[in-house]
Every structure is written in C-alpha cells, then in structure tokens.
Amino acid sequence: LVKLGGKDDKNAVVLAAHMDTLGGMVCQIMDNGHLKLTNIGGMNPNNAEAENCKVYTKSGKVYDATFQLENASVHVNGEYSDTKRTYETMEAILDEPVKNKEDVKKLGIMTGDFVCFDPRTVVTESGYIKSRFLDDKFSTAILLGYAKYLKEKEIQTERTIYVLITSYEEVGHGGCAAIPDGVTEMISVDMGCVGKGLECDETMVSICAKDSMGPYDYQVVSGLIKAAQENDIAFAVDVLSLIHI
C-alpha cells in the first residue's frame, strides 16, 4: 500500500491491482517418479497441456519439467483424444533421470513445492503482447506508471490517492484489510473479459456492473462511465456472471 498524496485525506480513493498469478503445486510424488499437481488459483489443466514448467524446491533449486497427460503418446494411447484433462489424469514429468519416488526426493523435491508454467511471452512487430498470466500484471504496471507520472509531473490530486498491490486475488483472500481510514472509494483495475454475450472487445475499457456475487457500487460504476464518456474513452459495461472479482 502506497500513498501517492492528494489534498483530501477524508475523501480518499484506493486504486488496486493484484500481482499474484496462476500456477501449480506438487501434491503427490508417484511411485514412478512422476508428479501430481494441484492448481494454484484457476489454472485450468486444459490450458497447460504439454507445457514446459519449473519446479521450485524449498532448498532453492529449480528443476525443469513438462505437464502432460498420463500415457501421453498418441501412438500407444487409444483413449488420448477422449480423455478428459484434469489434475487427476495429468502429471508433471521431470527432465531428470528419475525412475521412482526415492530418486525424486533425492533431488530435494517434495509435496508443497510450487510449479510455474512457461508464460510464452511474445511481443509482435505490430506492438501486440501475447502471453499467459497477464492477469493482473498489466494492471499492476499501469498503476505503477500512473504513480511515476504523478511524481515526475509533481501533480497534487484533489483527492488523496492510495495504490494497493495485493498478492492474494487468485486464491480469494482479497485486499480489504489494507484499506486506510478516510477512503470512500476503491477501484480495482483488472483484466477485462471478451467473449460471447459481452459488449467489450480488446480495445475497450471494461466496466463491470455485476459479477457472480452481486452488483457493484452504483456510484463508482456511474462515475467510471461518466469519466469515460467525458474523455472519449471507448468502454463497455458488462455483467461477468462466471467470476468473482
């Protein structure tokens, strides 16, 4: 939590984003030396099939692995295409000559070790950024850039502004405990959704009116809409019924 300054501490606003991301954790070392994983946050195994990953041990050593379906060769597995991808049917294969559980333990790998997946970050010639796990690193960068702008331009805002970067969003803890006295609004900056039934596209600001838990604050939503309209910012208001932000 960082205070950026401002003239009115009794009508302050918090701008929040989260820096935590999706991943996995070792939950079982199999007798054959393969690793069973459990998800951290909403990491979907369908999106991680055949992905390179790294196992981070408690001793600080890092080991490469691949997350794939059990019996992963289409040449020997007749049920390959029909098998549902879940954490029960998939496993991490270490890039180490391990044959059993004891071999894995000798490397220092144990249950509870975090597993990080390759983000596959690409910056195209046309300026597009493609990557896994941009949620919510982009928004964190935006808020840091805004703080830098205010400092360099020596801008004193009418309302006191706090920037809150949380590290618990993906596991549901939220950031309510860090709200200072005098704050009357909190605006969460997160990734917008694009898809069937939504108005937003990739060039717009996405304003969420309601998520799976209920409607958002009327005054805050109305204020965001008004600000976008007055500044000619392309935006869409959507209901995100499958997520809780």
Segments (PLM) and residue ranges:
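N-terminal hydrophobic/helix-forming segments and targeting peptides
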Residues: 1-243
